[in-house]
Curated annotation (Swiss-Prot):
Enzyme superclass (EC): ligase
Species in which this protein is naturally found: Clostridium botulinum (strain Eklund 17B / Type B)
Sites where the protein binds L-aspartate: 180, 226, 454, 495
Summary of subunit composition and partner proteins: Homodimer.
UniProt name for this protein: Aspartate--tRNA ligase
Length: 599
């Protein structure tokens, strides 16, 4: 049984003692990192979140403590009191390595079984074990550092926004399901049998209602939930830095958030963000980088060579051009040395992005080599080389198809080449850009209708309003994303604040007037009472912390994350609900086979 503190107070953290504390009597508390014997003495490395301190036990120092220390094992939680003395053998690798504590009193506060993971930095352990014993994983110093960064970041964000007159307002967690986008997490109501709340995917409608309420500037650091198929760096519940402002335009919101980013990155990471952050339209981003979140830490832009090859007698190029597609290419510097096997692998790679294949031209010292050599004339080859700005030693990698496939496949290939050939020279670089003028709609082949690229409340650009009903695919939006090193850090838009325009938007999305009022009636009703022009933005806090902490795994920055299947190894959630609870809610569970037949 563990001993009680009985009034004993910790006077210093384990990582704090230095030479100036020699001669002082202190009390430390923490966990045993390791213990060892040497020359009739026992040594314990005592650890807390600040670091490690060596504690020495000896018969001549204190016989009772010396005897007690013999039973101590790794991860025992203990308290030690004694005098700080200079170490005979200095350890310059530790901040506390010039001193040690001569233990005069030892309390074993609690014992520990042999831990399933070793508490150390850069732990190499299976993810399911780390998540099951997350409380042990979180004892590691590198994990503590991440959560100190997270805490410092949220404080920095709050300081900046409140200095700019933002008000922190909480919005409901139990809200209405408005199916549009990702699936909702549903919560059954006991009081309203057969009815459900939804956990919010974002506070979108409520923050707009706060603008109608005259709050002017709102922010919230808030949990959001999406029941979607998880990718590597997605979680079913995530944290968002959410904000909304009244009487603003796009430039106002972007300028404010540039200031926020500069403030946070300087205060938390000592990084100077160059302002103003550059801007790029969605169209330019797709045409140059094949992505609406381009990584600008390296070059290799996509180049359109359709004009150069339009007269070639090569059916792949010809059919793509005739179908309204294009032929585009990347120039890989030094790519002429690639053999047939790696080139074939790149061809297989682009096929995973629906491309039909990859044509290539290599500019070798002894001439041109190409997978489509028999279709190339000297004039066409020279024209392609000139357009691409290619030189001897380079390779030109070509895809022909409809533009969505060309952009997607070459965009992915560009990133793959950057990885293979280590084109990103400075891994610590933070390269920001704004992407603007997103399409307002995208066409869903599955649903056979247009869906909102962002959400149904995004304002269209005035000059494109004439196409809202006749050609929705042409309409650009007042939406903007902030991209960092090829990842979306945040996004937002100017909102529709006119009820008539909002109803037109719903109609363009295929909603009847009745459906629009059923789903969003509380917003439309509010729009009858003088809504101000407004807009906002939301940052993914978890992703921001990943950048600031230098980790590529989102699970590292969340205290108790789920795995890729939205399962919690620690608490074993989700679990089977009690039959009594289900009866109270009026819920019955279909057998698995019956459920599949229903589907």
């Amino acid at each position: 049984m563990g001993e009680a503190l009985n009034g004993l107070k910790r006077t210093m953290m384990c990582g704090e003692p230095r030479e100036e504390h020699v001669g002082q009597k202190i009390t430390l508390m923490g966990w045993v990192q390791r213990n060892r014997k040497l020359g009739g003495l026992d040594f314990i490395d005592l650890r807390d979140k600040t670091g490690i301190m060596q504690v020495v036990f000896g018969e001549e120092i204190n016989s009772e403590a010396f005897e007690k220390a013999k039973s101590v094992r790794p991860e025992y939680c203990i308290a030690v009191t004694g005098e700080v003395v200079k170490r005979e053998s200095v350890n310059e690798n530790m901040p506390t390595g010039f001193v040690e504590l001569k233990c005069e009193s030892l309390k074993i506060l609690s014992e520990s079984e042999t831990p399933p993971i070793y508490i150390k930095e850069n732990l190499d352990a299976a993810e399911n074990i780390r998540l099951k014993y997350r409380y042990l994983d979180l004892r590691r110093p590198d994990m503590h550092r991440i959560f100190e960064i997270r805490s410092k970041t949220t404080k920095s964000i709050r300081d900046y926004l409140e200095k700019n007159d933002f008000l922190d307002v909480e919005t409901p967690m139990l809200t209405k399901s408005t199916p549009e986008g990702a699936r909702d997490y549903l919560v059954p109501s006991r009081n309203y049998r057969g009815m459900f709340y939804a956990l919010p995917q974002s506070p979108q409608i409520f923050k707009q209602l706060l603008m109608v309420s005259g709050f002017d500037k709102y922010y919230q650091i808030v949990k959001c939930f999406r029941d979607e198929d998880l990718r590597a760096n997605r979680q079913p519940e995530f944290t968002q830095v959410d904000m909304e402002l009244s009487f603003v335009e796009q430039d106002d919101i972007m300028a404010l958030n540039e200031g926020l980013i500069a403030h946070v990155f300087k205060e938390v990471a000592g990084v100077d963000v160059k302002l103003p952050i550059k801007r790029m339209t969605f169209k330019d981003a797709m045409e140059k980088y094949g992505s609406d979140k381009p990584d600008l830490r390296f070059g290799m832009e996509i180049t359109n060579i359709t004009e150069d090859v339009k007269d070639m007698d090569f059916v792949v190029f010809k059919s793509a051009i005739e179908a309204g597609g294009s032929v585009r290419a990347l120039c890989l510097k030094g790519g002429a040395t690639l053999g047939r096997k790696p080139l074939d692998k790149l061809g297989e790679f682009v096929k995973t992005y629906k491309a039909k294949g990859l044509a290539w031209i290599q500019l070798k010292e002894d001439g041109v080599k190409s997978s489509i050599a028999k279709f190339l004339t000297d004039d066409v080859t020279n024209s392609i080389i000139e357009t691409m700005g290619a030189e001897t030693g380079d390779a030109i990698l070509i895809v022909a198809d409809k533009e969505s496939v060309v952009f997607q496949s070459l965009g992915a290939l560009r990133l793959e080449l950057a990885k293979q050939f280590e084109l990103i020279k400075d891994k610590n670089e933070f390269n920001f850009t704004w992407i603007t003028e997103f399409p307002l709609f995208e066409y869903s082949e599955e649903e056979e209708r247009y869906t909102a690229c962002h959400h149904p409340f995004t304002a269209p650009m005035e000059e494109d309003l004439e196409f809202l009903e006749s050609a929705p695919g042409k309409v650009r939006s007042k939406a903007y994303d902030l991209v960092l090193n090829g990842e979306e850090l945040g996004g937002g838009s100017i909102r529709i604040h006119d009820m008539e325009l909002q109803q037109r938007m719903f109609k363009a999305l295929g909603f009847t007037e009745e459906q629009a009022w059923e789903r969003f009636g509380f917003l439309l009703q509010a729009f009858k009472f003088g809504p101000p022009p407004h807009g906002g933005l939301a940052f993914g806090l978890d992703r921001m912390i990943m950048f600031l902490a230098g980790t590529e795994n989102i699970k590292d920055v969340i205290a108790f994350p789920k795995n890729q299947n939205a399962y919690c190894y620690l608490s074993e959630a989700p679990n089977i609900a009690d039959e009594k609870q289900l009866t109270e809610l009026g819920i019955g569970i279909l057998p698995k086979q019956e459920k599949q037949e229903q589907e």
